[in-house]
């Protein structure tokens, strides 16, 4: 449990929000999942804000994200990148280039179900289909404010919920594009990503999601397998 919080940190109001009735909530969800059918690849810049109870000021860093359906992603935090979270197929690496270290996380059959559920929270903004999404999350609230849909979610996995009791997804009201994510941890700390300069379906070489550890890198496996 403790080792996953650094992983998420390495990566996850002008007017009063208006709560939507159930019927409108379903309509918004239907439109969101319909928009996902047109998403094959995605790229964006982001500003990440980490709010910790032990610090009086939040920590702010810039980064870049690449995503390819169904589940490949590359998060680069810092300019130049100080941390890279990279998933391709059934394997994910968290890479620390300056330290020449990396951590390997399996997503396939060798990964414990509890860890798989928790690591999958990294992709909450890109759901594959509604059935899988609703199996993973309970929708706590859906509001509209400042031309943005604000969706509050709770993981259904008890293990994931003990780490992160709530996460929020922000979607543009005009095209349901991902505008931001915010992860709330059990200790009250928060990690928010605000996306800008997003590009829908840019041409991406599959190699940007692949990584082979250089000989001078130390690679560890937190799962011990």
Region annotations inferred by a language model:
Residues 36, 114-132:
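Short, solvent-exposed helix-to-loop capping segments enriched in aromatics
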Residues 60-62, 80-81, 88-89, 162-166, ...:
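Short, surface-exposed coil-to-beta transition loops
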Residues 18-58, 213-225:
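N-terminal leader/targeting segments and the immediate start of mature chains
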Residues 64-118, 191:
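An acidic-aromatic
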Residues 1-8:
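Bacterial N-terminal signal peptides that target proteins for export
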Residues 103, 130-217, 221-224:
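Gly/Pro-enriched, hydrophobic low-complexity segments
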Residues 8-17:
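Bacterial N-terminal signal peptides
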Residues 53-54, 74, 81-84, 94, ...:
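Short beta-strands and strand-coil junctions in structured, solvent-facing domains, enriched
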